[in-house]
Amino acid sequence: MSGRRERTKAANRAAILAAALQVFAELGYGATSVRDIVRRTDLASGTFYNYFPDKDAVFRALVEATGDEARRRVRSARRSARTAEEFVESGYRAFFAFIVEDPARFAFMRSNLETIRDRFGDAVLPAGTEELAEDLRAAIAAGHLAPVDVEYCAHAMVAVGLELGARLAERTPPDVDGATEFATGLFLGALERHALTVR
């Protein structure tokens, strides 16, 4: 009985998240109500509150899940890099490709960029920046990157990725190759100039 109950709980939570993804994409965060989300499910209206206290909580859950998966893919791509170019290019390409690959997630992000950045950035930014800093230190130690100020570099690379990702989401069609090439060229140039100044 316990196993069935857990499966039901997991299915209900997944149904709420899937419905919320669609509604937030269509209406945007500000115009969406809990009632709008529940209407897209087969659940009773009170069931929502067994899983989330309000729309903020379900929105945050979507942002966190998206951020977790994006970080996993980006980090996996970066760790296979053996040169500075591979390190920068692979991370940005993995991130930009992730943004556009799922139409529902892409629509959600496209409709809620400002809300994600302004109200829920704390759900994803610190962890992503710290992971990038760790990977930068490892790449420097392995000789794949010249020594840099890791804190500055990590924050700058994350900021550029987020801003270009936002612009990517606004373009039709989204240009993953163009965004990747621009970000890679920008940081390779900066890394090369920095390497020359510290020699």
Model-based region annotation:
Residues M1-L27, A31-L43, A57:
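Basic, helix-initiating cap at the start of DNA-binding domains
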Residues T41-F52:
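Short hydrophobic/aromatic patch on the recognition helix
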Residues A61, R72-E101, M157, T180:
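Hydrophobic alpha-helical connector segments
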Residues R75-A77, M109-I116:
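Short linear capping/connector segments at secondary-structure termini
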